[in-house]
A protein has these predicted regions:
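Conserved catalytic-core motifs of GNAT/GCN5-like acyltransferases
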Residues: 1-7
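Surface-exposed, flexible loop/turn segments at secondary-structure boundaries
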Residues: 8, 34, 113
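Active-site-adjacent scaffolding segments
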Residues: 17-57
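Extended intrinsically disordered, low-complexity coil regions enriched in Ser, Thr, Gly, Ala
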Residues: 1, 135-151
Length: 184
């Protein structure tokens, strides 16, 4: 689904609605000064310049205040208009952490009732995520047990040395009506 343009970040979005409140988002940088000025725009541009691929993963929370207090940083407001004119609003935190350490997710708190997981009919669900990285580092960043953050989704840890030394999201497995599909 065409998710629209985020003028403040200099990026364009497409989303794939999934079951259980999940979604995948395809993001590309625009040729716009905001893509170089905002942390998220810089992260997206950097990944695009490296040839594309998985950027990161995101953990949604009902309240970012404890995360702000723990990390000693303030969340940044985000919003974007969809092609139908509706607007999504959220706060996000930790995008710069993704630049420094690609295994780390960033955090999001939705401020609008609407959500990308409702864009279209969801027929697939995330059943497994492969992450190259250090489980303890990610738990420390999250400030909680990983099983709570993943809510029933299996995590497969990949040794970065078997992933060309790269950390971060390696693959997402989707259960579809036609079987499991691995996106890498």
């Amino acid at each position: 689904t065409d998710g629209g343009i985020h003028p403040r970040f200099g990026t364009r979005y497409f989303t794939l609605a999934l079951k259980n409140g999940h979604y995948l988002e395809v993001v590309c940088p625009l040729e716009h000064p905001a893509a170089d000025a905002s942390p998220f725009g810089r992260v997206v541009s950097q990944r695009a310049n490296e040839g594309g691929g998985w950027l990161t993963w995101v953990v949604s929370t009902e309240d970012l205040t404890p995360v702000e207090n723990r990390l000693g940083r303030q969340a940044v407001d985000g919003s974007r208009k969809r092609p139908d004119g509706s607007e999504l609003k959220w706060k996000q935190l930790g995008v710069l952490g993704t630049l420094d350490d690609s295994q780390l997710p960033f955090f999001i708190q939705w401020l609008s009732d609407d959500h990308p997981s409702t864009d279209g009919k969801a027929v697939a669900e995330i059943v497994k995520i492969e992450i190259a990285g250090d489980e303890k580092s990610i738990e420390e960043w999250l400030g909680s047990d990983l099983s709570r953050a993943f809510d029933g989704v299996e995590i497969q840890w990949v040794d970065p040395s078997t992933n060309d030394g790269q950390t971060g999201l390696v693959a997402v497995h989707l259960s579809t009506p036609n079987g499991v599909v691995r996106l890498d």
